[in-house]
Amino acid sequence: MSITHVKAPTSRLHFGYARCDITPPVGIYHRMWGAARHDQATGVHRALQADIVIAEPLGGDASQRMVRVQLDFVLLDNDQTLRLVTPVAASANVAPDQVIVTHSHSHSAGFFPANRYTMPGGDLIAPFLAEVNAKVAAAAAEAVATLADATVTYATTQCDMAANRDYWDDEKQIYTTGFNPGQAAENTAVVGRVTADDGSLRLLLVNYACHPTTLAWDNTLLSPDFVGALREVVEHEQNAPCCFYQAPCGDLGPKDGFVGDTAVADRNGKQVGHAALSALYSMGPPQTDFAYTGPVVSGATIGTWGWSAHDQARQAETIAFAGGSTDIPLDLIEIPTIASLEQDLERFTVEQTAADAKGDAVAARDFGARAERCRRWLGRVALLPQGKTFELNFSVHQFGDAVWVTCSAEPYSWLGSELRRRFPDLILFISPISGNAQVAYLLPRDRYGQGLYQEEPSALAPGCLEALTDAISAKISATTGHQAKD
């Protein structure tokens, strides 16, 4: 049977938005890379941003209010997140569990774990984060003040800026983390256009999977990485703010990355920005679908299509509003002991000092990187619970034809592609790195035991990614009534 009606995915809801600048001070602790030889930021490439989105059912209902805070940080630990969520919840007049914090994950935004406070520039971290908490809370109040009925229209496109980064070095017989041209990558970009009821453009949303690791150990500037130029391209063309949401990217990074040149980060961002614009140009007016309007006899008999306003039944579909957050218990691996990690840290630090004294820059860099891995594990161990399981948080919210998903940690892109395979009729806006940073990556079961970097810092056992995917899938089905495809 011929298809005569193509839905333009739509959410009709009560919507608020605000943003603020959260650029750290120059001199703050910055070294995210084990191979870096600097500790402190020496300048600013582009400003860092916090975006606050508030969603309620159409017409408004504060009891169902969802507050989403998006930060241009690599991550915050659970205590830092709680210190942010508490004032934001108060400003937005919601319970803390109605506030969801996600991160763009830029590796050049500064690095703020508690065990960095005593390092060069670490003294600036606590006062800076206190300032961020106040700024974001004030922005949350601004977002509440902007709440009004709105329409979000979605479209998907593809962008090849990101690539698989699990590269097998045949000569050295090891996996490295870098561009892997032999493996196809998840390249879906989801774009949302938020319009007011008077037709004015309020906000553009971009959801795309790529580690913001264009800039690496040679970069000493504070930067949102490719996200800054992405926003600039979209905002310049559309004359409206743009909010970027990271998507599952544990195995994805820029094809052209791990450099110190900020021009490369800007070029990567422009590539994603123009892909987002291509999706925006494919959209029709708000609250319309694309419908067949019949034949017209011309030199050929033309099949004509046009944008058709939503009827009452279609409007009812687009105002669906439901969901929330939940936890899933996942198995932990055998966690390294603090004593063994401290012993390794001391040994690598001594070896780094000796290599520096000999003028062996490469060896010093390598020993410094190994010492950094120990510091990160010590930070994780301090935050992991006693016992053999970890309660990992995720959220599922249905907004009309779209489902917004968040989850903790850093899952491989398989999470996104598999959920889209199971729910082809839904728009999925999927964002990881929502707390619980201490558990690090979630790899597919068959990727463990191969020597991949992502396994080294990960606290969760094989099978956890699949368990999380099944839990999210079940929650989507329960929330929306859509059954997952086998």
Language model regions located:
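Non-catalytic substrate/cofactor recognition surfaces at enzyme active-site rims
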Residues: S2-D486
